[in-house]
From Swiss-Prot:
Organism: Aspergillus clavatus (strain ATCC 1007 / CBS 513.65 / DSM 816 / NCTC 3887 / NRRL 1 / QM 1276 / 107)
General function of this protein: Chaperone required for the export of the chitin synthase chs3 from the endoplasmic reticulum.
Keyword Membrane among record annotations: yes
Residues annotated as transmembrane: 49-69, 85-105, 123-143, 151-171, 185-205, 220-240, 250-270
Keywords of this entry: Cell wall biogenesis/degradation, Endoplasmic reticulum, Membrane, Protein transport, Transmembrane, Transmembrane helix, Transport
Subunit structure: Interacts with chs3.
Keyword Transmembrane: yes
Compartments (UniProt record): Endoplasmic reticulum membrane
Pfam families linked: Chs7 (PF12271)
GO cellular component, one term: endoplasmic reticulum membrane
Superkingdom in the source lineage: Eukaryota
Protein name per the record: Chitin synthase export chaperone
InterPro entries named among the record's database cross-references: Chs7 (IPR022057)
Length: 332
């Protein structure tokens, strides 16, 4: 195995791109692809065959959790980095939808659109890591968050990495531009080296942010838990996927655990951001009722009324004195 080869990776885990890289296989009519040692069994539901049933189920859960996180972020109207972090969750949602379409077999392998969907999946993964990296700078207030510069810097860098990863993937799959399924160094560098660097730099920046600017150390727990579950997911995917698959009679494989662990890691990104972010209550719009609670009523004789004590005033018998308010049945 040389640097950038997917032979050993695809032998252990059935990644979608494994059917698009590697030498031609005479056992599959000369088609390109690397066959994994073990595949998760398919599930038949309503006369429809669903590939990777367990992983597909986790994708659906991830979509629901992402919607909840987006709604919570949107409710924090004045939080620092609100627009930037919500872009991260939108990209994660798009990646989850694309992965669900691929893993569930909506676009089956060997079909015409399949290489383009896998290339889009790779592009979204690169865009997600780049978006996370740029979000790491927001907390340092190098530029004003939520502004045109901040938001579009994030969007453009993420879009550029999506295009770069998509093009390298599709050129490799289609043997275009001097690239080929047997020359996967560029694809390996973009998918693994650059993405790993983005995540590592983000983690270092957040550690510096917490240690230097915050007195509370609880956010370090969110970072640590996110890193642990992410690493566990990657190890289960790339090192033990075939072992898991064989021992559970092909019901599960490493892709199921990696998808679940990635969801937990993304949730820790949200928890970390939510914990270190404070709203400006003076300018925020409350969405929860009864934010201010009256503990007890004043005595009757101490209540303020709008009646004037001067009986000779022309305003003493104002018609507004006895008008009932629609809020709390109070009299004005």
């Amino acid at each position: 195995m040389g640097f950038g080869d997917f032979d050993s990776i695809c032998a252990k885990t059935a990644l979608p791109l494994c059917s698009l890289v590697g030498p031609s296989s005479s056992s599959i009519s000369g088609s390109t692809g690397i066959i994994s040692n073990c595949y998760a069994r398919n599930v038949e539901l309503a006369n429809t065959i669903i590939f990777e049933g367990a992983a597909s189920f986790v994708h659906i859960i991830a979509l629901a959790m992402t919607v909840i996180m987006i709604l919570h972020v949107r409710s924090k109207f004045t939080a620092v980095g609100r627009k930037e972090i919500i872009t991260f969750f939108y990209i994660y949602m798009a990646l989850t939808i694309c992965s669900l379409v691929i893993d569930a077999g909506v676009v089956p392998p060997r079909s015409g659109p399949f290489p383009y969907f896998v290339a889009a999946q790779n592009g979204l993964a690169s865009a997600l890591c780049t978006c996370l990296l740029v979000n790491g700078f927001v907390g340092f207030q190098l530029y004003e968050d939520g502004t045109f510069l901040s938001v579009w810097l994030l969007r453009l860098t993420s879009a550029v990495m999506f295009v770069v990863s998509f093009l390298i993937s599709i050129l490799t799959f289609k043997s275009w531009g001097g690239m080929s399924p047997t020359n996967t160094i560029g694809l390996f560098v973009v998918l693994y080296i650059l993405n790993a660097l983005c995540i590592a730099i983000y983690l270092v920046m957040q550690l510096l942010l917490v240690m230097n600017t915050l007195e509370d150390r609880w956010p370090l727990g969110h970072i640590a838990f996110g890193v642990i579950v992410f690493i566990c997911g990657q190890v289960l995917l790339y090192a033990f996927s075939d072992t898991i698959c064989d021992n559970v009679q092909h019901y599960l494989d490493g892709l199921f655990f990696a998808t679940f662990c990635n969801l937990l890691a993304v949730m820790m990104v949200y928890k970390f951001w939510d914990y270190i972010t404070k709203e400006d209550l003076e300018f925020s719009v409350g969405i929860k009722p009864n934010t201010w609670e009256v503990k007890e009523l004043l005595p009757e004789e101490d209540r303020r009324t709008t009646a004037y004590q001067d009986s000779h005033s022309e305003y003493a018998g104002s018609m507004y004195h006895h008008r009932a308010s629609t809020y709390g049945n109070q009299n004005y």
